[in-house]
Amino acid sequence: MSEGGSKDSSGSECPVCYEKFRDLDGASRTLSCGHVFCHDCLVKYLLSTRVDGQVQRTIVCPICRYVTFLSKKSSRWPSMLDKSSQTLTVPVGLPSTPSPDRGGHTNPLVISHQVWRQSSSQGSQVPLDLLPSLPRESQIFIISRHGMPLGEQDSVLPRRSLAEISEASPAPSATRSFCCRSRALLLITLIAVVAVVAAILPWVLLVRKQA
């Protein structure tokens, strides 16, 4: 738990979409840093930060840049989950592209709300043009209480094996050794060529004089 957990971050509205939590039944979700957002804004963030179609298991708080870890939970009936629990229901296969701001930058949490509407049955928002193609089973993620500062994000990213790293980029000592061997081989070859020329040249000149 970071220092942000001690802040008064349980405000009455989502700091992203400014929707009142009292108008969104059970929609507030608290990250490990203590900042509170609505369910739909966090889902949009996860959709916009997918890598190769896979939802990431982390959320970076846009306020304090603290990383919150997520754990995946499978459920065939996501609508039956407790709305007050720290869960995020992420639809499978929904394309989502953040809209750039005036400076040309994109904020993953700031996505157009024009294509989203309030669902009367679940109290959550779904895209209007994607309702017919929604899968029956969604991905359920649980917001954990564990996190870390963004400066340590290198431990969050997937790591390659040591074999892949060494194969992709040789060690500096091996590179220097190879360069030294190449230079020594080139120098020996040059000395050998000069010695051969020095040995043959007098005989060539002598033959020309006799001729």
Curated annotation (Swiss-Prot):
ZnF region ranges: RING-type: 14-65
GO molecular function, a single term: zinc ion binding
Domain of life of the source: Eukaryota
Keywords: Membrane, Metal-binding, Transmembrane, Transmembrane helix, Zinc, Zinc-finger
Keyword set includes Transmembrane: yes
Predominant cellular place of this UniProt entry's protein: membrane
InterPro entries xrefs: RNF222, Znf-RING_euk, Znf_RING, Znf_RING/FYVE/PHD, Znf_RING_CS
Entry's localization field: Membrane
Protein's membrane topology: Single-pass membrane protein
Disulfide bonds: none
Entry's Gene Ontology cellular component terms: membrane
Classification via SMART domains: RING
Pfam families: zf-RING_UBOX
Transmembrane segments: 187-207
Protein name (record): RING finger protein 222
Organism annotation: Mus musculus
Lineage: Eukaryota, Metazoa, Chordata, Craniata, Vertebrata
Gene: Rnf222
